[in-house]
Amino acid sequence: MKNIHKIFSPEKKGKEKISVVTCYDFSFARILNETEIDSILVGDSLGMVFQGNTSTLPVTLEEMIYHTKAVRRGAPDKFLIADLPFLSYQTSIEEGIRSAGKIMKESDCDAVKIEGGSEFICELVSILKQIGVPVMGHLGLTPQSVHVFGGHRVQGKGEESSSKLLKESISLFESGVFSMVLEMIPAELGKKVSQEVGVPTIGIGAGSDCDGQVLVLNDLLGLDINFQPKFLKKFSNLHSIVKEAIADYDKEVKSGEFPGKDHSF
């Protein structure tokens, strides 16, 4: 079930969509393992969703390994991708190799994801592929560069910006990524990139013409009522469900109804 060539086959382009979910913990991963989801991403977005930070920048490689190990234990049958966090690969090719090797060896993930499409990143992708590390690319709004962008804004809107992103996507493809995430770019640009590159594109706010989609599990389940970006569809309202369950528990504890005979030894 974890065959990279089956899940992210270029032959799927334009035919069968790929479903990816971002997850950070054992309990949810165990549920995902029972579904038809194609792949799980352990994203450095855990810095915001799980830790409560305002960006992904504080996340460390050790924290990524910790969470990826937990997800792997819960989802042994899924193709598992782990983010390399900020400054774990940007300082040098050697550091990138060490970080990728460390997270793959210690967490048992199947691939790593890195952000950007510069000449340096493409060189790193090429070398990692040569030594046996599958790499997923990430273009558009790359959260590790949020301060450069001036916030979480749609990328690739102007002609110069869109041309640059398209060029980077082709360079990433030629460098050997097996897939690439396209985040918060115009739908038409997402379509164009998907047509130009020979590997599956996974969109998040990049339109319906990408070869697949990714959402954070907590977001699609509706756990955060305050988070509602345009690209997000909430498939449930767990915030209300969880809140009601806790209220019922609180009420029964205080009334003495719980624990009853059925819950006592």
UniProtKB/Swiss-Prot annotation:
Keywords: Cytoplasm, Magnesium, Metal-binding, Pantothenate biosynthesis, Transferase. It is found in: Cytoplasm. It catalyses: 3-methyl-2-oxobutanoate + (6R)-5,10-methylene-5,6,7,8-tetrahydrofolate + H2O = 2-dehydropantoate + (6S)-5,6,7,8-tetrahydrofolate. It is an enzyme of class 2 (transferase). SUPFAM superfamilies: Phosphoenolpyruvate/pyruvate domain. Pathway: Cofactor biosynthesis; (R)-pantothenate biosynthesis; (R)-pantoate from 3-methyl-2-oxobutanoate: step 1/2. GO terms for molecular function: 3-methyl-2-oxobutanoate hydroxymethyltransferase activity; magnesium ion binding. The keyword Cell membrane does not apply. GO terms for biological process: pantothenate biosynthetic process. Binds 1 Mg(2+) ion per subunit. InterPro entries: Pantoate_hydroxy_MeTrfase, Pyrv/PenolPyrv_kinase-like_dom, Pyrv_kinase-like_dom_sf. Its EC number is 2.1.2.11. Signal peptide: none annotated. One of its GO terms (cellular component) is cytoplasm. The keyword Magnesium applies. Mg(2+) binds at D44, D83, E115. The active site is at E183 (proton acceptor). Its cofactor is Mg(2+). 3-methyl-2-oxobutanoate binds at D44, S45, D83, K113. Homodecamer; pentamer of dimers. Belongs to the PanB family. Catalyzes the reversible reaction in which hydroxymethyl group from 5,10-methylenetetrahydrofolate is transferred onto alpha-ketoisovalerate to form ketopantoate. This is 3-methyl-2-oxobutanoate hydroxymethyltransferase.
